Amino acid sequence: MREERPIIALDFPSFDDVKAFLEHFPEDEKLFVKIGMEFFYAIGPEIVHYLKGLGHSIFLDLKLHDIPNTVRSAMSVLGTFGIDMVTVHAAGGVEMMSEAKKVLGDKAKLVAVTQLTSTSEEDMRDCQNIQTTVQESVVNYARKAKEAGLDGVVCSAQEVELIKAATAEDFLCVTPGIRPAGSEIGDQKRVMTPQEAHQIGSDYIVVGRPIIQAENPWDAYHEIKKQWNS
């Protein structure tokens, strides 16, 4: 089922920055926010508990990638945090992903990172020695994530249709690299607008800088939400 709220990437260096950002929103506006590695490693689980206490939904994007037993143990802890979604890296393999899903169960959605939206085909070939197209690599990772029992993948909106055709219509596609029309793409190389992501079948979109760096984050959020639901 498609999530109507854009997920806001809280890419901040400090707790105080997040608190200041949230002051732009009414207290009764329950957000869906993403906590990434930088923020989680700087603050720790306290930030998750704080945001859950305010009633917000949490996407914990840690991209776990290690041997199956280690990821299983880590996921057993993360599953106690009350999070709504969490990531592992598909490159860790089917066994690793499967072990993570077994221990997490239905406590949260488990999605796999395929290829980062900052990865170009040249990067993939030179650094990863994967001699296929980005789309072929992403679809292969998606199939493996589905095989492992995961709920979906993180992918560019440009790969959504291919992934759903290769897996299932209800296999979730979480798409970062979303930019409103006319905004700068930054370090993202595979981007789409919120409306385009909706039309192509994305289930969740993740938006960072266009909201958190906006002069008025509340207005920016609602404009992106309107585009996403149009």
Curated annotation (Swiss-Prot):
PROSITE patterns: OMPDECASE (PS00156). The keyword Ribonucleoprotein does not apply. SMART domains: OMPdecase. Pathway: Pyrimidine metabolism; UMP biosynthesis via de novo pathway; UMP from orotate: step 2/2. Pfam families: OMPdecase. Keywords: Decarboxylase, Lyase, Pyrimidine biosynthesis. Substrate binds at residues 11, 34, 61-70, 117, 179, 188, 208-209. Its EC number is 4.1.1.23. The keyword Transmembrane helix does not apply. The active site is at K63. It catalyses: orotidine 5'-phosphate + H(+) = UMP + CO2. GO terms for molecular function: orotidine-5'-phosphate decarboxylase activity. One of its GO terms (biological process) is 'de novo' pyrimidine nucleobase biosynthetic process. One of its GO terms (cellular component) is cytosol. Catalyzes the decarboxylation of orotidine 5'-monophosphate (OMP) to uridine 5'-monophosphate (UMP). Homodimer. Belongs to the OMP decarboxylase family. Type 1 subfamily. This is Orotidine 5'-phosphate decarboxylase. It comes from Streptococcus gordonii (strain Challis / ATCC 35105 / BCRC 15272 / CH1 / DL1 / V288). The lineage of its organism: Bacteria, Bacillati, Bacillota, Bacilli, Lactobacillales.
